A protein has these predicted regions:
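Charge-rich, low-complexity N-terminal segments
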Residues: 2-174
Length: 174
């Protein structure tokens, strides 16, 4: 089976799979203590893919200079436990919970974890990300993440025209 066939097969299996639990989505913002390097991105992504597959968690981490936004999805207990661990992580500070909610669908269907730095991203993506980040940071309490914001985050994950490889193992953690 070719790489493309394997990728499409994994995508199809994931799409067909019905979750046997409500999807819990948590979004948070933070600031890194020091700038992330490419090696940091690679390390976070490789460790997160393995750990998130074991928990049946999917995620997207976006970093733009001193701004971090992450979306995590999965079982509520698994996502909340992961968030507690993230809050204690000394690589970042000013951790703010933006949104924590149940949903009927998983938005980050095939990605155990995608890490995206915005170096080299088109100007409009940088500006839109910074505007959304500032808006969410300034909001009192929790906010509802809009479909437009989710679409922006997915566009960032796909920027450069290269979709992230599916990394979620179907049935993992179940």
């Amino acid at each position: 089976m070719s790489d493309e066939s394997s990728r499409l097969s994994l995508l199809w299996e994931t799409i067909q799979r019905q979750e046997d639990y409500p999807i819990f989505r948590l979004t948070y913002l933070s600031r890194p203590v020091k700038p992330f390097t490419r090696a940091d991105f690679d390390d976070i992504e490789s460790k997160s893919v393995e750990a998130n597959n074991a928990r049946d968690v999917t995620g997207l981490l976006i970093v733009n200079n001193d701004r971090i936004l992450q979306i995590l999805e999965g079982r509520e207990d698994a996502v909340r436990a992961l968030y507690t661990k993230i809050e204690a992580d000394r690589r970042h500070t000013v951790v703010k919970l933006v949104s924590a909610m149940e949903d009927e669908v998983r938005l980050l269907l095939t990605w155990s974890m995608v890490v995206r730095g915005l170096d080299g991203a088109p100007k409009h993506l940088l500006e839109q990300f910074d505007d959304v980040y500032d808006e969410l940071l300034a909001a009192e309490g929790e906010s509802e993440i809009s479909i437009d914001q989710i679409d922006l985050f997915k566009e960032i994950a796909l920027f450069g025209g290269i979709p992230p490889e599916p990394t979620r193992k179907v049935g993992a953690g179940s």
